[in-house]
């Protein structure tokens, strides 16, 4: 099988993530796409207001009707700081005989040389770069494949900010995820009592 790996915080998962998974399926003739939520990513902080379980629940809701998309919680189970090279090692043990593709956005690719053991990553899997910010292709000495995907200008941080400021997000998220966010009061601004006086 041809399997694409999409790692991320998914805080929250949004239609841009799902659209990219569908694009990858089509452009690379992928049999399965695996979403891997990170535990504690090395390159960003996750607010303690949203739990790992919240993020996994939202992934499950968003992807419940997608038969070619799976969720793997290997990074969550391993705990600690998440490094992609370790994630790849874990996934390779499960899918020994399959061809693996690691998909990252060009925003991450521009600093790929600063990742932990990048050479080991590109030796283990095919590195796929998706357009996220830049329309042009970035150059790198690391072996990689660029896909000509459509850029969907949505980010999880933008969604969190919009929710915190009471702005609409219904067109950016699957309905089930939006309902979960509302039901669990996620991403809302915490108002200090002193600010009300």
Swiss-Prot record:
Pfam families, sorted: CTP_transf_like (PF01467)
GO molecular function annotation: ATP binding; nicotinate-nucleotide adenylyltransferase activity
Keywords: ATP-binding, NAD, Nucleotide-binding, Nucleotidyltransferase, Pyridine nucleotide biosynthesis, Transferase
Catalysed reaction, written as an equation: nicotinate beta-D-ribonucleotide + ATP + H(+) = deamido-NAD(+) + diphosphate
Gene Ontology biological process terms, A to Z: NAD biosynthetic process
EC number: 2.7.7.18
Pathway: Cofactor biosynthesis; NAD(+) biosynthesis; deamido-NAD(+) from nicotinate D-ribonucleotide: step 1/1
Function summary: Catalyzes the reversible adenylation of nicotinate mononucleotide (NaMN) to nicotinic acid adenine dinucleotide (NaAD).
HAMAP family: NaMN_adenylyltr (MF_00244)
Family as reported in the entry's similarity comment: Belongs to the NadD family.
Protein name: Probable nicotinate-nucleotide adenylyltransferase
Protein species of origin: Borrelia garinii subsp. bavariensis (strain ATCC BAA-2496 / DSM 23469 / PBi) (Borreliella bavariensis)
């Amino acid at each position: 099988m041809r399997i694409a790996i999409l790692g991320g915080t998914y805080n929250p998962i949004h239609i841009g993530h799902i659209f990219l998974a569908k694009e990858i399926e089509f452009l690379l003739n992928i049999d399965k796409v695996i979403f891997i939520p990170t535990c504690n990513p090395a390159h960003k902080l996750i607010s303690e207001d949203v739990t790992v379980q919240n993020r996994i629940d939202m992934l499950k809701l968003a992807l419940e009707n997608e038969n070619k998309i799976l969720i793997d919680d290997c990074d969550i189970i391993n705990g600690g700081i998440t490094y992609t090279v370790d994630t790849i090692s874990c996934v390779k043990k499960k899918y020994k005989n399959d061809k693996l593709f690691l998909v990252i956005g060009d925003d991450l690719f521009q600093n790929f040389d600063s990742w932990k053991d990048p050479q080991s990553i590109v030796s283990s899997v095919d590195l796929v770069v998706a357009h996220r910010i830049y329309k042009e292709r970035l150059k790198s000495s690391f072996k990689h494949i660029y896909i000509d995907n459509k850029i969907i200008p949505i980010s999880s941080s933008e969604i969190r900010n919009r929710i915190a400021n009471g702005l609409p997000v219904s067109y950016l998220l699957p309905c089930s995820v939006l309902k979960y966010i509302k039901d669990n009061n996620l991403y809302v601004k915490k108002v200090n009592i002193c600010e009300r006086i």
